[in-house]
Regions:
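Tandem repeat domain/solenoid detector
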Residues: 36-39, 69-73, 86-89, 110-111, ...
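Short glycine/serine- and acidic-residue-enriched loop/turn motifs that recur at repeat junctions
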Residues: 44-61, 94-111, 144-161, 194-211, ...
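Conserved core positions of repeat-based scaffolds
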Residues: 30-33, 42, 80-83, 92, ...
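C-terminal outer-membrane/trafficking sorting elements
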Residues: 375-453
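Sec-dependent N-terminal signal peptides
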Residues: 4-13
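Positively charged n-region of N-terminal signal peptides that target proteins for export
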Residues: 1-4, 452-453
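An edge-strand/N-cap motif at the start of beta-rich repeat modules
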Residues: 17-47, 53-56, 62-63, 327, ...
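A recurrent domain-boundary module in secreted/ectodomain proteins
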Residues: 359-371
Length: 453
């Protein structure tokens, strides 16, 4: 007689987080995080391997990438990803037709691929189709598309390996947009280069630059973020500045007029963090509250509406927002307790909540596979359980994908089915123990505990 498994909707527990993700990065329609144990996780759009899991299958929940425990930082571009390990090595994967991975080819990669042999990489920024990085010696490097001079090497020639930009050894931070780059030196000066059609370089003109150009004379710039065609920055006194395109109010100055030089906005409280997406911006004030402004077509501002905002708008008065990441049309944020939140566009599962439903407000994303909220497909029958060799699945609905995950959240097996009726999965070679079977159907997802004997 068949042993049938009762299908349970696994509810979300707010007490299960402890410290989970400590670093986050959102790209075009994909997301990444590094956990406290140094593991790397990815989810969302994956058509060119930008998740790094060796497939081109989209994921709607965080999936561990490899088994390394020494990931240090990560940056996501439109369709490629960069990361640095604690040993100072540089890694890249995803789209590569313009050489933005930096491996000397123009071939896309579906798994993290080491770039060169240097062990002194310090920080990275993945732009739309190009990449920049700073080494521990303060040198600046860039590679990828260069049609607007966004690499800053004085040419408009694409590069498919990291190329040093100038000879300066005092670069502190760098940020890449669609086709422009902004950076800060250790002396607090601001620099920019690349496309300047909307004034996103901030030099008071709309003329593009093919090498780093100092912006103004201030020496107290502290944080920068290059959006698609606008820029935002903080000074060391906590003031917030913006410039460039303003069609959606992404500059936050109360207008929709482009500005080609840094312009201070909202001085009510010191700001401590800011980031920019395609046509919007996110920021955290010194009191830990979360704010946003700009384009809101998919709810990426997180205020519960689809209405664009041209001034900073309070999203959450909670006083423990710590890290933010703005992407093309979705947003990620971490609180100081390590809890992860996501909102905005979710067609490819880039929010990581196990669904493909857009979210208009910050939605908590559990890092524990034991507590993922799912839909229930009542037609599903899974047997036998416990299982020795083959798990059988019966469903009246179309089953797209099955995924088997261990108790640590690691993906063990992923299978594409694209059919209804009877399915089977052979797990004879699995070690004995508890696993979670995620079944993605046309009406939603189910996560089922299975015991391998």
């Amino acid at each position: 007689m068949k042993k049938l498994l009762v299908l349970l909707i696994l509810s979300l527990s707010l007490d299960s987080f402890s410290q989970c993700f400590i670093k986050i990065a959102s790209g075009g329609d994909h997301s990444h995080g590094i956990k406290t144990d140094g593991t790397l996780w990815s989810w969302g759009y994956n058509s060119l391997g930008q998740l790094g899991d060796g497939t081109t299958v989209h994921k709607d929940m965080p999936s561990q990438i490899g088994t390394s425990l020494n990931w240090q930082c990560i940056s996501a571009g439109i369709e490629h990803t960069l990361a640095i390990k604690t040993d100072g090595t540089l890694w890249a994967w995803g789209r590569n037709d313009y050489g933005m991975l930096g491996d000397g080819t123009n071939l896309s990669k579906q798994i993290p691929t080491q770039i060169g042999t240097s062990t002194n990489w310090q920080s990275i920024s993945a732009g739309d189709f190009f990449s920049t990085a700073i080494k521990t010696d303060g040198t600046l490097w860039a590679w990828g598309i260069n049609s607007s001079g966004q690499l800053g090497d004085g040419t408009t020639i694409n590069r498919n390996v990291p190329t040093q930009i100038g000879s300066a050894m005092n670069w502190q931070s760098v940020s890449t947009g669609f086709s422009h780059t902004i950076a800060i030196k250790t002396n607090g000066t601001l620099w920019a280069w690349g496309s300047n059609y909307y004034g996103q370089l901030g030099d008071g003109t709309n003329i593009g630059r093919i090498s780093p150009t100092q912006i103004g004379s201030a020496t107290n710039w502290q944080m920068i973020s290059a959006g698609s065609t606008h820029s935002v920055a903080l000074k060391s006194d906590g003031t917030l500045w913006s410039w460039g395109e303003n069609n959606y109010g992404q500059l936050g100055d109360g207008s929709n007029i482009n500005i080609n030089s840094p312009n201070q906005i909202d001085s009510s409280l010191p700001w401590q963090n800011v980031t920019s997406g395609f046509y919007y911006s996110l920021a955290i004030k010194s009191d830990g509250s979360l704010w946003s402004w700009g384009r809101n077509y998919f709810g990426q501002l997180g205020d519960g509406t689809f209405v664009d905002k041209n001034t900073p708008t309070l999203i959450s008065s909670d006083n423990n927002w710590e890290t933010i990441s703005a992407a093309e049309d979705h947003s990620l944020a971490l609180k100081s307790d390590g809890s992860l939140y996501a909102w905005g566009y979710n067609y490819y599962g880039q929010l990581g909540d196990g669904t493909n439903v857009n979210k208009l407000v910050p939605t908590i994303i559990n890092c524990s596979i034991l507590n993922v909220s799912t839909f229930l497909d009542k037609s599903l029958i899974v047997f036998p359980n416990p299982v020795k060799t083959v798990v059988n699945i019966q469903s009246q609905n179309h089953v797209y994908i099955t995924e088997i995950i261990d108790v640590n959240g690691r993906e063990i097996m992923l299978t594409e089915h694209n059919k209804s009726g009877d399915l089977s999965i052979n797990i004879e070679d699995f070690q004995n123990g508890l696993y979670f079977l995620k079944i993605k159907t046309e009406i939603g997802n189910a996560i089922i505990k299975i015991l391998k004997e």
